[in-house]
Regions:
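Catalytic alpha/beta core domains of metabolic enzymes, predominantly
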Residues: 4, 109-225
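Active-site flanking residues adjacent to catalytic metal/cofactor-binding acidic residues
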Residues: 13, 78, 192
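Glycine-rich phosphate-binding active-site loops on the catalytic face of alpha/beta enzymes
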Residues: 42-46, 96-107, 214-225
Length: 225
């Protein structure tokens, strides 16, 4: 994973959830026109707390992402939480998969995904677990490495941590936890997800700047029309 130009941060952007073909294509056309986005992202399966909440459009969303890739020339990535997701994503031509915070917190799910990725060449992003626990995050990384996902294809994503009291952030960054992961895995790139950390537009620029000041390698952001 690399951006063109010396030291330019990597930018991965796209909607939290793809909702329709029209929304997906319009979003990615806009991102491609920016000229600064390296990869497009979009969720098609959503791990919601309640079954009554939107669960994502499912595999049809992969078709829209693949179409956006074909039109814009930008590679695409999708969140996966089990082996079926991995198989469907790779079958649709995904260039990247990411493991979300809820999945990182479940070693059984992480191992299932790791086993499904064995022998593939896809880029793999691992978000921190919901709680500020370096153990769960470390364990997820170690499972990926053990499955043959080399450090050149494995990326950490810092998306903040669940809070139990009022805070200016939706998911407080607790920067020292992420920095400890960088100390443990200096060979891995790390991206910041300011969208999940902030939960709103206010604070995005400051959070992204903080990540840049800490020498993060880029941003993993939500963007949609």
């Amino acid at each position: 994973m690399a951006a063109e130009g010396a030291r330019r941060p990597v930018i991965i952007a796209g909607p939290c959830s793809v909702e329709s073909r029209e929304q997906t294509l319009a979003t990615y056309r806009g991102l491609a026109a920016c000229g600064c986005v390296d990869m497009i992202r979009g969720g098609v399966w959503k791990p919601r707390t309640y079954p009554s909440c939107f669960q994502g459009v499912g595999e049809v969303g992969l078709e829209w992402l693949a179409e956006a890739k074909a039109e814009t020339g930008l590679p695409f990535g999708v969140e996966v939480a089990n082996s079926r997701h991995v198989e469907a994503a790779l079958g649709a031509g995904a260039d990247m998969v990411w493991i979300g915070a809820r999945t990182t917190g479940n070693p059984f799910s992480v191992q299932e995904v790791a086993d499904a990725l064995r022998g593939t060449e896809v880029l793999v992003l691992v978000k921190n677990a919901q709680m500020p626990d370096t153990g769960l995050w470390t364990g997820a990384v170690e499972r990926m490495l053990a499955a043959g996902v080399g450090p050149e294809r494995l990326v950490l994503v810092h998306r903040g941590f669940a809070q139990t009291s009022g805070n200016e952030y939706r998911n407080p960054p607790v920067w020292h936890v992420a920095l400890e992961m960088r100390r443990r895995f200096p060979e891995l790139k790390m991206l910041c997800d300011p969208s999940h950390i902030c939960g709103r537009r206010e604070g995005l620029a400051a959070t992204a700047q903080k990540a840049a000041d800490l020498s993060y390698d880029g941003l993993f952001m939500e963007s949609h029309v």
